[in-house]
C-alpha cells in the first residue's frame, strides 16, 4: 500500500480487523432479516421462546421463490425511485451554505443544509396524498403507498441491503480515481480515511476508504446519513400505524407515542443536520459498507421494530394517559441532557463560558471539567440512550426483542467511548490522566 504525507497507511484495524468486518458484513444483514421473521403478521415472538418451524416456513424453498423475493421488480422500482428522487430534491431544494471542518490538505468542504425544505416537502406530499386518497377511495385515511411498504417489508429489507452493498462498492472504486482539480497541497489525491487505507480491499471497502466521496458538490455520505434511511424510517412507522388503524378501526396510544417520539427524533436530526458536520461520522470515518448499510438498511428496519411489533394483532398495548406522559417525559429528559450538554461544550469551545473550570493541555486545547461535563466524560451519551429507552417502553414487557435497540445502542456508545478514550489518551498524555482524576465516570455518573 502506497503511503503519502496526505494519506498515511492505516496500521490499526478496528472491529478486530478483517474477521470482525466479515462478521459484521454477514451478521447485521442476517440479524435485520431475522428480526422481521420474528416479528410480522405470520409470526410474532412472545417472551424468549422462538418457534423455528414458523420462521422456516417464511423462507423461500425453491430457487424461483428466492429469485422473486430478492429481485421483485415492483419493489426495486419503488426503492430506486425513492432514493434517486431524494437525490434530485437534495440537489434542487434551497438551503443555507455551510463549511465543514478543515481537512488534512487545509481545505474545507461546503455543504448545502436543506433539511427544513426537504422535511416540509415530505409532509406536504403526505398530506396531499391523504386528502386525494380520501376523495378517491371508499376507505377513510387509506394510502396505498403506506400499505405497499407494510406488505413488502422483507423484500424492501433485502433491497436496502443489496443497494447499500453496491453503493459501498461504487464509492470504493471511485476512491482510486484521481481528482479533476488539485487539492490543497497541489496533488490530485483524494483524502482517504485515516482508518480505511490499510491496503486490504475487503477491510477498506467495509470501513470506508475515501473520507468524503462526492459527485461534484453532492456529498454522498451526508446525504445517506440523514435522507433515505431516516425518512424511510418515518414512512415505515406510519405504515404500521396505517395498518393498525385499518385492522382495528383505531390506533392505540402506544402506537401514537412510538410514532410521535421517533418522528420528533427524526425531524430533529434532519432539521439540525449542520450538527453532523462536526460528528466523527463526517470528520473522521470513511464511507464504506459499515456506514452505507447502517444508514440505508439498519436504521430504518431495526429502529422501526417497535412500531411493527405493536401493529401485529394481539400485541396491542394500551398505556393510558399516565404512562404515556411519563414515557414522553423520559424522552424530553433525554433530549434536554443531550442538547444542553452538547450546547455547553460548543459554547465553551467558542469562548462563551470562560468561568467553567477546565484543564489547559500541552496541545493548546482545554478539557472541560465542570457543568455537564464534570458529571461524566460523555454525559450526552446518557441523554441519547434515555431517548432510545423511551421508544421501547411503549411495547410493554411481553418480549425482550423490542428492547434490542437500547441493548445494541448501549454497546455502540460504549464502543465509541472506548475508541475516543484511546485517541485522547494518545493525544493528551499526562493531561488526560489529570482529567480522568477530576472526571472519573465515563457515561453514567456514579455508575460507569
Swiss-Prot record:
- Which chain regions cross the lipid bilayer? 18-38, 75-95, 108-128, 157-177, 251-271, 279-299, 318-338, 394-414
Gene Ontology annotations of biological process type: ergosterol biosynthetic process; filamentous growth of a population of unicellular organisms in response to biotic stimulus
What keywords were assigned to this record?
A: Endoplasmic reticulum, Lipid biosynthesis, Lipid metabolism, Membrane, NADP, Oxidoreductase, Steroid biosynthesis, Steroid metabolism, Sterol biosynthesis, Sterol metabolism, Transmembrane, Transmembrane helix
- Write out the GO MF terms: Delta14-sterol reductase activity
Q: Name one GO cellular component term.
A: endoplasmic reticulum membrane
User: Pfam families, from UniProt?
Assistant: ERG4_ERG24
Q: Where does NADP(+) bind?
A: 345, 349, 368, 373, 380-381, 420, 424-428, 435
- Judging by the UniProt lineage, the source's domain of life is Eukaryota
Does the keyword section mention Transmembrane?
yes
- Asked if Transcription is a keyword of the record, the answer is no
Catalytic activity entry: 4,4-dimethyl-5alpha-cholesta-8,24-dien-3beta-ol + NADP(+) = 4,4-dimethyl-5alpha-cholesta-8,14,24-trien-3beta-ol + NADPH + H(+)
Q: How does it sit in the membrane?
A: Multi-pass membrane protein
Null allele phenotype = Leads to the accumulation of ignosterol (ergosta-8,14-dienol), and of a new sterol, ergosta-8,14,22-trienol. Results in slow growth and significant increased sensitivity to an allylamine antifungal and to selected cellular inhibitors including cycloheximide, cerulenin, fluphenazine, and brefeldin A. Slightly increases resistance to azoles. Significantly reduces pathogenicity in a mouse model system and fails to produce germ tubes upon incubation in human serum.
The top EC class is oxidoreductase
EC number(s) given by UniProt: 1.3.1.70
Pathway recorded for this protein: Steroid biosynthesis; zymosterol biosynthesis; zymosterol from lanosterol: step 2/6
User: InterPro entries under this entry?
Assistant: ERG24_DHCR-like, Sterol_reductase_CS
Q: Where in the cell is it found?
A: Endoplasmic reticulum membrane
* PROSITE patterns attached to this UniProt entry: STEROL_REDUCT_1, STEROL_REDUCT_2
What task does this protein carry out?
ERG24 reduces the C14=C15 double bond of 4,4-dimethyl-cholesta-8,14,24-trienol to produce 4,4-dimethyl-cholesta-8,24-dienol. The third module or late pathway involves the ergosterol synthesis itself through consecutive reactions that mainly occur in the endoplasmic reticulum (ER) membrane. Firstly, the squalene synthase ERG9 catalyzes the condensation of 2 farnesyl pyrophosphate moieties to form squalene, which is the precursor of all steroids.
Q: List the PANTHER family.
A: DELTA(14)-STEROL REDUCTASE, DELTA(14)-STEROL REDUCTASE TM7SF2
Q: Which family, according to UniProt?
A: Belongs to the ERG4/ERG24 family.
Full protein name: Delta(14)-sterol reductase ERG24
Q: By which gene is this protein encoded?
A: ERG24
